[in-house]
């Protein structure tokens, strides 16, 4: 799958930031409640994403308000590809919603209308009946509202999804879905998460692809091994 390495590297940098990173700020405000902490984490992620790409005129930041929630999508104007990032947990929930209901008001589902006509690798979801006219119209209007003047500049939507464990990022993938969340293509981002490419390297050639090295399974095995060693060390100290 062709994709922009610079945008993906920026997504990974942004998604490394977690709730635990912002915890000290909230602890200074209150030791009782931390209302808004999750939203603040996402605000920081979007700021990191935008800061990483701000100097390159190739990219357009598209700010999308969704009620209490506001997200930032990145348009690669040279390739007409829109990049969105989310957690793997949320992506799974959104796909399941469409599988059950055949429709969703979630922003990703509306954006994926752009990918209508792409051929999925297999039938991951059961055959979904066509939307009725009202739902189809809602989806199209929602898409146009989100992308505004850029709607005709987007030919493909790519979803970066990221997995977390013990408060830190442990894996991820870049996914191309059809308009019903059926997988067309996917790239494992685990290697880039484990061994980040220097930003200067990807800026010189944003379309480079990383060479696969150690799989995420080995990373998890290493983590477990390290945790076992630490537990044994602590036990010996006691």
What kind of region is each of these model predictions?
Residues 77-78, 88-89, 175:
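Secondary-structure transition/turn motif
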Residues 29-64:
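Short N-terminal edge-element motif at the start of the domain
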Residues 1-40:
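Interdomain/boundary linker segments immediately adjacent to catalytic/signaling cores
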Residues 53-83:
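A short acidic/basic microdomain associated with nuclease active sites
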Residues 96-161:
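Catalytic cores of nucleic-acid endonucleases
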Residues 141-238:
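Glycine-rich, aromatic-bearing surface loops/beta-hairpins
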Residues 73-76, 113, 174:
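Short beta-strand element of the conserved SAM-dependent methyltransferase core
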Residues 85-87, 92-100:
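Basic, glycine-/proline-tolerant helical and adjacent loop/strand elements
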């Amino acid at each position: 799958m062709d994709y922009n390495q610079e945008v993906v590297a920026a997504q990974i940098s942004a998604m490394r930031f977690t709730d635990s990173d912002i915890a000290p700020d909230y602890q200074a405000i209150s030791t009782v409640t931390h209302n808004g902490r999750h939203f603040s984490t996402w605000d920081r992620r979007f700021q990191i994403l935008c800061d990483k790409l701000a100097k390159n005129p190739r990219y357009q930041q598209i700010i999308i308000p969704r009620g209490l929630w506001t997200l930032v999508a990145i348009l690669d104007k040279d390739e007409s590809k829109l990049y969105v990032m989310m957690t793997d947990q949320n992506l799974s929930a959104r796909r399941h919603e469409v599988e059950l209901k055949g429709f969703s008001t979630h922003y990703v589902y509306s954006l994926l209308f752009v990918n209508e006509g792409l051929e999925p690798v297999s039938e991951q979801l059961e055959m979904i009946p066509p939307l009725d006219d009202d739902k189809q119209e809602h989806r199209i209007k929602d898409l146009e509202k989100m992308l505004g003047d850029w709607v005709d500049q987007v030919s493909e939507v790519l979803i970066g999804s990221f997995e977390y464990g013990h408060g830190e990022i442990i894996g991820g993938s870049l996914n191309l879905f059809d308009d019903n969340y059926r997988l067309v293509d996917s790239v494992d981002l685990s290697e880039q998460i484990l061994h980040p490419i220097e930003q200067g390297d990807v800026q010189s050639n944003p379309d480079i692809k990383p060479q696969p090295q150690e799989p995420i399974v080995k990373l998890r095995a290493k983590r477990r091994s390290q945790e076992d060693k630490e537990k044994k060390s602590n036990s010996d100290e006691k």
